[in-house]
Amino acid sequence: GLFSVLGSVAKHLLPHVAPIIAEKL
């Protein structure tokens, strides 16, 4: 379903977004 797609996308984006968030914090 839609949520499973969003979940898989989030798992792919998290490794890239986490370092950016860490730098802002």
From Swiss-Prot:
InterPro entries: Caerin_1. The keyword Secreted applies. It comes from the Eukaryota. The keyword Secreted applies. Its main location: secreted. GO terms for cellular component: extracellular region. It is found in: Secreted. Expressed by the skin dorsal glands. The modification Leucine amide is found at residue 25. GO terms for biological process: defense response to bacterium. Keywords: Amidation, Amphibian defense peptide, Antibiotic, Antimicrobial, Secreted. Caerin-1.17 shows significant activity against Gram-positive organisms, but is less effective against Gram-negative organisms. Belongs to the frog skin active peptide (FSAP) family. Caerin subfamily. This is Caerin-1.17. It comes from Ranoidea gracilenta (Dainty green tree frog).
